[in-house]
């Protein structure tokens, strides 16, 4: 009998804890996020502490990571986007390393849970909202009323633009979660199907799994990149009010 492909997404307590009647257990999801946070920090520290004129491999990797993200921020948001670079780099590292960690056998993919991806999306949403109001004051609300709109159409457009603005963190989080869940379920089903086959028919499915693992690793990086691109687009809208 094949194992339930959804069982890999179960959040399980590792260290049961309770305080004031609330469950604050340390779970496999929390451990995975802590591990990724430490790994991302160590990666940056290793890359940039004691940097040299002739870079080491880690320093070269860190410089590529830095330059690609700073160029992304500058090309989408503009010169004023430099202040958002730490946020964008952090999001990219956290999501990409979290996705890659999920490819390790028996590791937990925390980006497969909407509560995690929605929390990340809400960080971006809150940043855009707070910065937009701080920078433009009441002028921020002109974002919901496109220029040269007939007066009779204005109320409808305000409602539509407001709904689009509010739905951004929902679409941002759902896109990432759906891709991670779909890819892992497909891999799980094919991998478990190989077990029931005779040795004569196993080479082709095994080759397919290897190809899918490589593709899933690519998707893991791509989804982190898409998340950061869309985050930059949302930030650009409030920086330039369009």
Swiss-Prot record:
CDD domains referenced in this protein's UniProt entry, alphabetically: ATP-synt_Fo_a_6
Disulfide-bond pairs as recorded: none
Record flagged with keyword Cytoplasm: no
GO cellular component annotations of the record: plasma membrane; proton-transporting ATP synthase complex
TM stretches of this protein: 29-49, 84-104, 114-134, 140-160, 181-201, 206-226
PROSITE patterns per record: ATPASE_A
Membrane topology of this protein: Multi-pass membrane protein
Compartments where found: Cell inner membrane
Matches recorded under InterPro entries: ATP_synth_F0_asu, ATP_synth_F0_asu_AS, ATP_synth_F0_asu_bact/mt, F0_ATP_A_sf
Keywords: ATP synthesis, Cell inner membrane, Cell membrane, CF(0), Hydrogen ion transport, Ion transport, Membrane, Transmembrane, Transmembrane helix, Transport
Gene Ontology terms, MF aspect: proton-transporting ATP synthase activity, rotational mechanism
Superkingdom of the organism of origin: Bacteria
HAMAP family hit by this protein: ATP_synth_a_bact
Function: Key component of the proton channel; it plays a direct role in the translocation of protons across the membrane.
Subunit structure: F-type ATPases have 2 components, CF(1) - the catalytic core - and CF(0) - the membrane proton channel. CF(1) has five subunits: alpha(3), beta(3), gamma(1), delta(1), epsilon(1). CF(0) has three main subunits: a(1), b(2) and c(9-12). The alpha and beta chains form an alternating ring which encloses part of the gamma chain. CF(1) is attached to CF(0) by a central stalk formed by the gamma and epsilon chains, while a peripheral stalk is formed by the delta and b chains.
NCBIfam families: ATP_synt_6_or_A, PRK05815.2-4
Family: Belongs to the ATPase A chain family.
Protein name: ATP synthase subunit a
Organism: Orientia tsutsugamushi (strain Ikeda)
């Amino acid at each position: 009998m094949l194992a339930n492909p959804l069982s890999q997404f179960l959040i399980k307590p590792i260290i049961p804890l309770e305080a004031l009647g609330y469950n604050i257990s340390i779970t496999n999801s929390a451990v995975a996020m802590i591990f990724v946070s430490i790994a991302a920090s160590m990666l940056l520290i290793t890359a940039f502490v004691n940097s040299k004129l002739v870079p080491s491999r880690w320093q070269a990797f860190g410089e590529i990571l830095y330059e690609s993200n700073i160029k992304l921020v500058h090309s989408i948001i503009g010169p004023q986007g430099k202040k958002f670079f730490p946020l964008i780099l952090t999001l990219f590292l956290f999501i990409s390393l979290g996705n890659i960690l999920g490819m390790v056998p028996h590791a937990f993919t925390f980006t497969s849970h909407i509560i995690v991806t929605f929390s990340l999306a809400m960080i971006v949403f809150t940043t855009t909202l707070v910065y937009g109001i701080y920078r433009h004051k009441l002028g921020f609300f002109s974002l919901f009323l496109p220029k040269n709109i007939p007066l009779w159409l204005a109320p409808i457009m305000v409602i539509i633009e407001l709904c689009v603005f509010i739905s951004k963190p929902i679409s941002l989080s759902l896109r990432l979660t759906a891709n991670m869940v779909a890819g892992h379920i497909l891999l799980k089903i094919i991998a478990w199907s190989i077990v029931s086959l005779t040795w004569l028919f196993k080479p082709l499915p095994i080759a397919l799994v290897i190809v899918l693992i490589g593709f899933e690793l690519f998707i893991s990086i791509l989804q982190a990149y898409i998340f950061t691109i869309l985050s930059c687009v949302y930030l650009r809208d409030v920086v330039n009010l369009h």
